Amino acid sequence: MAALITSTTAATAASGPLVDYLWMLILGFIIAFVLAFSVGANDVANSFGTAVGSGVVTLKQACILASIFETVGSVLLGAKVSETIRKGLIDVEMYNSTQGLLMAGSVSAMFGSAVWQLVASFLKLPISGTHCIVGATIGFSLVAKGQEGVKWSELIKIVMSWFVSPLLSGIMSGILFFLVRAFILHKADPVPNGLRALPVFYACTVGINLFSIMYTGAPLLGFDKLPLWGTILISVGCAVFCALIVWFFVCPRMKRKIEREIKCSPSESPLMEKKNSLKEDHEETKLSVSDIENRNPVSEVGPATVPLQAVVEERTVSFKLGDLEEAPERERLPSVDLKEETSIDSTVNGAVQLPNGNLVQFSQAVSNQINSSGHYQYHTVHKDSGLYKELLHKLHLAKVGDCMGDSGDKPLRRNNSYTSYTMAICGMPLDSFRAKEGEQKGEEVEKLTWPNADSKKRIRMDSYTSYCNAVSDLHSASEIDMSVKAEMGLGDRKGSNGSLEEWYDQDKPEVSLLFQFLQILTACFGSFAHGGNDVSNAIGPLVALYLVYDTGDVSSKVATPIWLLLYGGVGICIGLWVWGRRVIQTMGKDLTPITPSSGFSIELASALTVVIASNIGLPISTTHCKVGSVVSVGWLRSKKAVDWRLFRNIFMAWFVTVPISGVISAAIMAIFRYVILRM
């Protein structure tokens, strides 16, 4: 009993003088919340930026998921405050007799880190919250105790991580995406290989992320008592179990879903429909031709119509912005959608009978081009077929307009012409064809004629003419009208010449279905781990401040209070909702276009890099890993798809993060020491 009384008295005596610093504790809580806000506005983009960029989730959905997993992760995993940040960079034992100076240093470090992260968020530059707090900690220590208080060897490791993190993560992401593209994306039918690889992908995702979470040794979950072999065994066991579940239950369901999506509604068929076999196409063609003959007998067409001599197999078009997929040789034929009740004449001057009775006749020049190259596909399109709505949806997915909510993006205007929009969204010039109207024995005839090279006159065309124009590759991307590019938001991309190349290698609908949930799962795991890791950056100095005030001991080993972690988690979530979209736009849209397959490669390889680097002992930055992966995968898809000027700005922001946050922290610490505390 006497010993207990003695220890209690000693603790009270130690903390007694610190009561005068209550104002500093309150100020520290306020600044810590601002710091957590800035972490949410900047660092959370690491977890869901690529998912939003690929269109897998909207910004609102990302904020909801991130709020849940960041908060849970901060409470469950954040109890193990990073020793590198709190004690590894400076010698805290030097502040045994000057606890007030250490408290002032904690406030200064939080202020310097928060200010620079807010500035970076305003500039839409993703930076490392870890390196911010590192620079700020070094800054106040230099003012308080000089160079003797800094462990420069730890700083050298951090400088190395600037280059190791993006390089290592970029290499891993590049290798993974190369394998995915070679064995899945570039296959004529990517579904079989994709379904075979699905259990492996899920197993790797679950195994790597579970190991990362358990390896942190969270006390609340009891992971700190697990040996390394136990962590590995549990991770591998869960991964194998997940693979079996996916193989026996998820894959069959996914296969049925893909088949159902392929047999899509008529409104989607102009873009996404894919027939199962040529035999089915032939049967449907026969049926459609018989219907046409019953409804529009050849004799009724008139002298201008040549009897139906050949029927071309049906093939609908799946195209990308500014890009046409290479069709197999057997499909490089003029084709029409006979389901739309259209007949085709196989004579030299081919003519197509429209459902409304109109006859569209191709001129000699167009027919010669078709016959010589076999590259142009012509389809009938009705204005009520839903194409306009489908194209609008496709554009929004490609530009991430519905996910970003960027008010600066100007929506395309229809301009009273259905197909001006059709052609603009396909990335085609508006003057590729001219429409000439005339009368031919009581029948309306439209002629498609080859344009003169110097003709730039805009004309209004009906849906059929413009859709033919859209799917025909008549001009190179460099000849696209600048106004169309401006409306599509492509004309401003200084970092990539030939901006249409940024849309290359877009995932097919069935491939997107395979990778969508994988990317969401990986992002949720990443957000959970991020909440536990980065809450240390926001709350670590506050924990030190609070424990010094509460116990009077600068090297206190008291467990971190849960309510402090929850406080930081709430601040992170508010920062994400209020200002998170700015950096998310940079990570998911501006740096390079993201697809579900590339986004999954980025997420998984980044998580693997963090696990490896953590075992090595590097204070690795998740931000640097994600940016390195995004740039690496974007460069593999197309060198011109990466905005290298933006990447240069991001790298420069990394380079100045430690000095700027350190200078701000040092300035505040100087005010505390020489003006306020006079110590």
Curated annotation (Swiss-Prot):
Annotated region (A), positions in chain: 550-558
Which InterPro entries would you find in this protein's record? Phos_transporter
User: Which keywords annotate this record?
Assistant: Cell membrane, Membrane, Phosphate transport, Phosphoprotein, Receptor, Symport, Transmembrane, Transmembrane helix, Transport
The way it spans or sits in the membrane comes to:
Multi-pass membrane protein
Which GO molecular function terms does the record list?
Answer: sodium:phosphate symporter activity
| A Pfam family assignment | PHO4
Chain ranges passing through the membrane? 21-41, 62-82, 100-120, 158-178, 203-223, 230-250, 511-531, 558-578, 600-620, 650-670
Q: Name one GO cellular component term.
A: plasma membrane
Q: Which reaction does it catalyse?
A: 2 Na(+)(out) + phosphate(out) = 2 Na(+)(in) + phosphate(in)
Record's subcellular location: Cell membrane
**What are the recorded Gene Ontology BP terms?**
cell population proliferation; phosphate ion transmembrane transport
Give the primary localization class: membrane
Phosphoserine modification, residue list: S265, S269
Compositionally biased region (Basic and acidic residues): 271-286
Region Disordered: what ranges? 268-288
**What family is it from?**
Belongs to the inorganic phosphate transporter (PiT) (TC 2.A.20) family.
Function recorded in the entry: Sodium-phosphate symporter which preferentially transports the monovalent form of phosphate with a stoichiometry of two sodium ions per phosphate ion. May play a role in extracellular matrix and cartilage calcification as well as in vascular calcification. Essential for cell proliferation but this function is independent of its phosphate transporter activity.
**Protein name stated in the entry:** Sodium-dependent phosphate transporter 1
Species the sequence originates in: Pongo abelii
> Organism classification, top ranks?
Eukaryota, Metazoa, Chordata, Craniata, Vertebrata
Q: What gene makes this protein? A: SLC20A1
